[in-house]
Amino acid sequence: MKNSTSIAIGGFDGMHIGHQHLFSALGERGTIVAIETGYANLTPKRERENFTHYPIMYIELEAIRHLSGEEFIAFLKEKFPKLQKIVVGYDFQFGKNRKHAVEDLKTLFDGEVKVIDKVTFEGESVHSNKIRTKLQLGDIKGANAYLGHNYTIKGEHISGQGIGTTELVATINLQTDGFLVPKEGVYVTLTRIDDEEHYHPSVSFIGHRVTTDGSFAVETHVLDGEVICKERASISFVRFIRDNKKFETLSELKEAIKKDIAVASKELQFLQL
């Protein structure tokens, strides 16, 4: 990273299509500078690295929020001695109390400043907050369009209720700390098990088990045969099927799950996984 001549600065949670426009302006010797605010839940921790070939430097906001505009530029030059170009979004702000905007950056930095205009999809500007809202509303297709990829959560394999295999269908239960989970309900998904390179067609449930014990669950049922999950799995969301619903009996729930499986199977039948 010390040899980088260009950097893109931002939060970059989600690594959505707007972010990718910034990265396309970096050139060959570029680095992404991700400012960690503590709010990243679309691509938490180091998940952003899965959506770019550029190296990423993570900087905690608390470490720089007290810096003046001049001090911030000096900080960047210390981190990147060969810095020639800074790429930012049109709404970028920096310095103590977010005092400075892109015009100040052009004044304070003696190299090139590339400002990327807002990126839109179907007339709407793309922002991470809008993606979060879409996920919370169950608008998976809308969120994925803004992201430029399927929204994906990851987690450690945990024990479930134990009634899936015997009374309903076998599921893999996950503890997905750090990720924003979509609206409660049932989804067409793709599931990746442990270190496998491919995804399995699946149907997944997010929410409280209102028909049984009321506990919250993130669980996925793989459609192409029985699989064994040893440690972890990823769930990639394709589309919303239905809301979470309380059924009077387990047999009613099982019938609903059969219908969910049929919907997911039809949706995913033409995908090359």
Regions found by a protein language model. Name each.
Residues 55-64, 117:
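A conserved beta-strand->alpha-helix junction
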Residues 42-50, 71:
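Glycine-rich loop at the start of a catalytic domain that most often binds anionic cofactors/ligands
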Residues 2-5, 25-30, 52-56, 81-82, ...:
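Short glycine/proline-enriched coil/turn segments at helix->beta-strand junctions
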Residues 1-45:
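N-terminal catalytic cores of NTP/NDP-binding nucleotidyl/phosphoryl-transfer enzymes
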Residues 67-171, 194, 248, 252:
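Classical nucleotidyltransferase
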Residues 39-41, 64-67:
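Acidic-and-aromatic substrate-binding clefts and catalytic sites of carbohydrate-active enzymes
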Residues 160-273:
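Phosphate/ribose-recognition catalytic cores of enzymes acting on nucleotide-derived substrates
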Residues 31, 85-87, 114, 221, ...:
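A structural signal for isolated positions on well-ordered beta-strands in alpha/beta enzyme cores
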